[in-house]
Amino acid sequence: KKEYAGLLDIVMNRKTDWGVIFDLFHKERVSVDKLLMGPDFFEIVRECYNRKYPNIVFSDFLWTMRSIYLPLFRIMKMDVPKADLYHCVATGYAGVLGSMAKHFHGSSLLISEHGIYTREREEELIKADWVKGVYKNIWIERCKKMSFLAYEKADIVTCLYERAKSLQIELGCPEEKTQVTPNGVDPSRFENLVVLPQMQDDKVHVGAILRVTPIKDVKTMIRAFAYAKKKAPSLKLWIMGPTDEDEEYAKEC
């Protein structure tokens, strides 16, 4: 049946008729827990396993797939109020919810990405200790799948700069939907700033205003600056921003 085929397409990371999937999860009789523990999902996972991952332990694979799809399936069980416009500030689960709302209510969907969700999740998963080996790739595929859905269904997708736009297109967003909306800066507000005494020298001052956290990859910036300083000794780096979000990382920096 078409619902089974749709779920298999999701798990196999193939082109998916998401309308069929959204309709499935809005049927009263569908229980997420029963679906994940039932024979249909078991057979779908087994088929995926036999085709793509026959060299790993099946029981581990089965429970991982249940864990991966539990939050996604629960999101799709949610009721979304009718609106003229839905605005998602990321792809991921938010993008799934926005896409589902558009499916049921026929409204417009705007996605405005600050960071690129798929790339950020990929970086986190690569570094994560709680997921190993091939399972990292499986999680990353699921994140890409959700973002692709959001890009496909959105009417407009914005980002902050051209490189982010290129990433969105690379991840499947149609170029005609993308727009760069940079953070606004009024230079006149900074014209009369007082220069600190420690900056009144012949150094070339470079500033970074950010949260000192792993997602900002401050360590790489420091290493890059060290390389640059060898080439240009007059450089001086200032890192400005909160350090309390990940104090251990801040100390390492």
What residue ranges belong to the model's regions?
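Conserved nucleotide-sugar donor-binding subdomain of glycosyltransferases
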Residues: 1-83, 135-138
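Membrane-proximal helix-turn-helix segments that form the acceptor-binding/catalytic region
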Residues: 73-82, 117, 134-157
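Short N-terminal targeting/anchoring amphipathic segment
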Residues: 77-93, 104-110
